[in-house]
């Protein structure tokens, strides 16, 4: 049994076990098997190769001929929510996932459907997904396709027939709001999967399974027994970085999210981009006496056979701002100081680009790639030099970057030819302030999304942000730690990147385009319209001697749920291009443009209380009425008068529950719904242009 957990005396163990283990939940642990190394003509694993570079050796498409790219085929994913999947291409078949963890198998030559598999995720589980009902893809191994379902199952599907071979519930507690949105990885004969849910206060871990029989070799960390000693030294060391006084909050414990995204490369261990979000976000709330709170916001290396801890590097000690480390890790061999070094390249949400020695986890360098104000840099020991003006409690904090900003989950690529990393960067403005009234799972008006289980310990935007949003593509030199070129986009929330040996970088954008750039200087080479905004990354592969580029498109994700940069809202689609492609683009559909809601009576005295209720239950899905435009989910300020007049019919066992809308029966009263209506209508009146 593969277990790396912490167990110690009961009076100390329970909070830490459920806290630090949770830290491993947000763990972006991308684990890749050397046996699944992608042949040049295929895209067999999530990051293309066992180093996660998203660099293809295909070179048929070049800066000179990229303008000749044309559509070859498109495929309708029959979905209306966010599409974050990286397609996998093996033996002439593309496997791609849609929202709600639905798997599609396509003939890569024609784009025709071979089969689909729907794990039939109960739609009430949608409320447990902080950031949309997305899925980032599958793993393919020895005739099976593996997918993690949103409700926490790992499913093995026959790659030829699309029939389920086996499934396993990966959750250690079915009563907790866990989700899986990440792609599984296959490493050394094991299927490995992580999970998410940090905002909801769930405990993180990674599980490994035998792909042939669905047996589970182990859990990291394992559930453990609080009456026993710590199970290894790493958990005992982590326990010392948490304040026991802050570990039990109300009826709950400190929580941390994890999502699988580590890398294995003949080094004997898996490098795990680890624990994402500590919960609550407020460090003072979860650990009043301080402490670094290992292993949150860290890169952790584990033995792939046993899950044994090897080393860690914490990028944001005592994380106060949701600076997850779940972004892509890339393994590279570069020359530093005249010597070859085996390194990890990483650009997480805290706004710094890191170069870490992957053999021992030692810090090499870090440099901010966008403006930051939470820290002025990193010292020689790899600790951030923090800005004391951000100290809590009470301060309004206009943090740069904000929690959704600088980078997010969107994929990075690295070219050994140019020596550059290519990644989307952004600013999504946010103001945070410690919430003095916060208690675990005790939702109060004004606490963002606490009504559906979020535990932030922070007030979100107690006053409007001052900075402006932006989105850009950055080409970064990890040796010199400097930007080489950038491309400004019209909005944040752009897709991940692909780079090829032909010196071409591909990226999709929030304003519904697929772009090609010269990898050397950033010159735009080609553009194709997409049916809606793009958040996923493209892939490339070769069929019958011809290079193709494919991308799965569908607007959504947490930011894309409530706003948009394109007026197109075509259902989720896979688009495939090649030189000389002559197929016609499918017809695009557009958002229906409605006027601000009016003509419904409300009591202006209810607006203030309705504001807090709306923030607590609605804001991160529907946005601010009449201010945000609406994205994957409609903005209620542009609803019809009939909809708002009968809002209770949508809130209580409403018609959109089959699409994932929560049922607020027993959580809101009819009187509270009236006050939410007043806020929607009052805000619409406030922003309506004066005649």
Swiss-Prot record:
Residues 605-684 form the Cytochrome c domain. Its cofactor is pyrroloquinoline quinone; Ca(2+); heme c. Ca(2+) binds at residues 199, 322. Pfam families: Cytochrome_CBB3 (PF13442), PQQ (PF01011). SMART domains: PQQ. Residues 1-38 form the signal peptide. Induction: By butane and 1-butanol. One of its GO terms (cellular component) is periplasmic space. Optimum pH is 8. Heme c binds at residues 618, 621-622, 661. Disulfide bonds join 130-131. Keywords: Calcium, Disulfide bond, Heme, Iron, Metal-binding, Oxidoreductase, Periplasm, PQQ, Signal. The active site is at 322 (proton acceptor). Pyrroloquinoline quinone binds at residues 84, 136, 181, 197-198, 349, 408-409, 558. Binds 1 PQQ group per subunit. Binds 1 Ca(2+) ion per subunit. Disruption phenotype: Cells lacking this gene show a delayed growth on butane and are unable to tolerate high level of 1-butanol. When both bdh and boh genes are inactivated, growth on butane and 1-butanol is eliminated. One of its GO terms (molecular function) is oxidoreductase activity, acting on CH-OH group of donors. Its EC number is 1.1.2.9. InterPro entries: Cyt_c-like_dom, Cyt_c-like_dom_sf, PQQ_b-propeller_rpt, PQQ_MeOH/EtOH_DH, PQQ_rpt_dom, Quinoprotein_ADH-like_sf. SUPFAM superfamilies: Cytochrome c, Quinoprotein alcohol dehydrogenase-like. Monomer. Belongs to the bacterial PQQ dehydrogenase family. Involved in the metabolism of butane. Could be important in the detoxification of 1-butanol. Catalyzes the oxidation of 1-butanol to butyraldehyde. Also able to use 1-propanol, 2-pentanol, propionaldehyde and butyraldehyde as substrates. This is 1-butanol dehydrogenase (cytochrome c). It comes from Thauera butanivorans (strain ATCC 43655 / DSM 2080 / JCM 20651 / CCUG 51053 / NBRC 103042 / IAM 12574 / Bu B1211) (Pseudomonas butanovora). The gene is bdh.
């Amino acid at each position: 049994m593969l277990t790396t957990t912490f167990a110690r005396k009961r009076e100390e163990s329970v909070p830490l076990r459920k806290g630090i283990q949770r830290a491993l939940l947000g763990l972006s642990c991308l684990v890749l098997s050397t046996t699944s190394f992608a042949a040049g003509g295929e895209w067999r694993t999530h990051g293309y190769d066992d180093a996660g570079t998203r660099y293809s050796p295909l070179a048929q498409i070049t800066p000179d001929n990229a303008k000749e790219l044309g559509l070859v085929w498109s495929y309708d994913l029959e979905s209306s929510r966010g599409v974050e999947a990286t397609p996998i291409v093996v033996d002439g078949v593309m496997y791609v996932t849609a929202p709600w963890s639905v798997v599609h198998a396509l003939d890569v030559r024609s784009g025709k459907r071979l089969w689909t598999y729907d794990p039939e995720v109960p739609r009430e589980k949608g409320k447990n997904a902080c950031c949309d009902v997305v899925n980032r893809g599958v793993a393919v191994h020895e005739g099976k396709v593996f997918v993690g379902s949103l409700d926490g199952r790992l499913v093995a599907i026959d790659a030829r027939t699309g029939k389920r071979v086996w499934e396993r519930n990966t959750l250690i507690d079915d009563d907790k709001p866990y989700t899986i949105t990440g792609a599984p990885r296959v490493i050394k004969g094991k299927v490995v999967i992580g999970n998410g849910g940090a905002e909801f206060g769930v405990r993180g871990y990674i599980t490994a399974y035998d792909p042939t029989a669905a047996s589970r070799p182990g859990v990291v960390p394992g559930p453990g027994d609080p009456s026993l000693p710590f199970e290894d030294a790493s958990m005992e060391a982590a326990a010392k970085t948490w304040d026991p006084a802050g570990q039990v909050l109300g009826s709950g414990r400190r929580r941390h999210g994890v999502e699988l995204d580590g890398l294995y490369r003949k080094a004997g261990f898996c490098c795990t981009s680890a624990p994402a979000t500590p919960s609550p976000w407020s460090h003072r709330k979860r650990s009043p006496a301080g402490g670094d709170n290992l292993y949150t916001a860290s890169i952790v290396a584990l033995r792939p056979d046993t899950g044994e801890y090897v080393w860690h590097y914490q990028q944001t000690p005592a994380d106060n701002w949701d600076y997850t480390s779940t972004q892509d890790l890339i393994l590279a061999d570069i020359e530093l100081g005249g010597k070859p070094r085996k390194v990890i390249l990483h650009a997480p949400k805290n706004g710094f680009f890191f170069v870490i020695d992957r053999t021992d986890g030692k810090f090499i360098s870090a440099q901010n790639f966008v403006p930051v104000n939470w820290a002025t840099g990193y010292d020689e020991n790899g600790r951030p030099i923090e800005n004391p003006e951000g100290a809590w409690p009470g301060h309004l904090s206009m943090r740069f970057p904000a929690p959704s900003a600088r980078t997010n989950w969107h994929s990075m690529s690295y070219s050994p030819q140019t020596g550059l990393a290519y990644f989307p960067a952004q600013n999504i403005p946010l103001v945070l302030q410690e919430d003095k009234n916060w208690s675990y799972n005790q939702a109060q008006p004004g606490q963002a999304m606490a009504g559906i289980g979020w535990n932030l310990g922070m007030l979100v935007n107690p006053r409007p942000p001052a900075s402006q949003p932006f989105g850009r593509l950055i080409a970064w030199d990890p040796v010199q730690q400097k930007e080489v070129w950038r491309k400004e986009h019209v909005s944040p929330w752009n897709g991940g990147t692909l780079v090829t040996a032909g010196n071409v970088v591909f990226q999709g954008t929030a304003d519904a385009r697929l772009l090609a750039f010269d990898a050397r200087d950033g010159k735009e080479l080609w553009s194709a319209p997409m049916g809606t905004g793009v958040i996923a990354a493209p892939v490339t592969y070769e069929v019958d001697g011809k290079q193709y580029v494919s991308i799965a498109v569908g607007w959504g994700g947490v930011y894309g749920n409530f706003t948009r940069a394109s007026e197109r809202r075509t259902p989720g689609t896979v688009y495939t291009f090649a030189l000389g492609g002559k197929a016609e683009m499918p017809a695009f559909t557009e958002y229906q443009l409605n006027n601000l809601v009016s003509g419904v009576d409300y009591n202006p005295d209810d607006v203030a209380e309705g504001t807090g209720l709306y923030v607590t239950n609605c804001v991160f899905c529907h946005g601010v009425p009449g201010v945000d435009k609406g994205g994957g989910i409609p903005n209620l300020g542009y609803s019809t008068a009939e909809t708002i007049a009968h809002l209770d019919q949508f809130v209580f066992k409403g018609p959109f529950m089959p699409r994932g809308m929560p049922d607020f029966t027993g959580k809101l009263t009819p009187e509270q719904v009236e006050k939410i209506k007043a806020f929607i209508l009052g805000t619409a009146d406030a922003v309506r242009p004066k005649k």
